[in-house]
Amino acid sequence: MIKHVFFDLDRTLWDFEKNSHNELVNLWSKHQLHQKGISLPEEFIRIYKRINEDCWTLYRDNAITKEDLRTKRFANTLEYFGILDAKLAESIGHDYVTNCPYRTELFPNVFEIIDYLKSKYELHIITNGFEEVQHVKMKQSNLTEHFSEIITSEKAGAKKPHPQIFAYAVEKVGVSAQDCVMIGDDLLCDIEGAVDFGMQAIYFNPHKVKHNLNVLGNVQDLIEIKAFL
């Protein structure tokens, strides 16, 4: 019987794409990248997103450190445009990590589904995001008060989809995997990781990604979770 609901944060509750995009446009303007050969913010964002995803994959695989990720993603983006300026990359990286968590765009129906679920279940977060950043996001977006435990990969010592982070989460809460459901947008990290550990899972799948995993439900809007819980 499900008693505890674990949510992913980025791209599930907190709209990472919108918040990140808006901050990157701001940084393109603030650091006058148009004067350095990057004529449109969309060019900057397109290349950054590709490089950032590659860096996050390396970080999840423990191939680079948190500090490497923060340094390389902007340095490599600028280098793509022929800008070899370590200080500029460091400055942009610092501004991004400092400012982006204060942006508060959430997915539709976040508070509606939280209000529905919290009367029936205990709610928690499991996230691969950085400890200090995720807590700021949640506080600024008025999410913190709704969740009993906020499990970060840094605190758990492992990143999703590794079973260690799910083991840490259920031990922290004091339940078994069978009592839990994981809700997230990442098919590998959130859904496959949780299912392999023995949890049930609901796939937040707004882009209608096809898959063969045995899940409790697929939803394109968070409010649809009501049909399964």
Predicted regions and their residues:
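Asp-based, Mg2+/Mn2+-dependent phosphohydrolase catalytic module
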Residues: 1-5, 17-18, 115, 130-229
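N-terminal helical cap/lid subdomain that shapes the substrate entry/recognition surface
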Residues: 2-108
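A generic structural signal for short
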Residues: 62-63, 102, 123, 154, ...
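Short, conserved clusters of charged catalytic residues that mark active-site
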Residues: 108-109, 164
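Catalytic-core regions built around general acid/base machinery
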Residues: 109-120
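Glycine-centered short loops/turns at secondary-structure junctions
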Residues: 120-121, 198
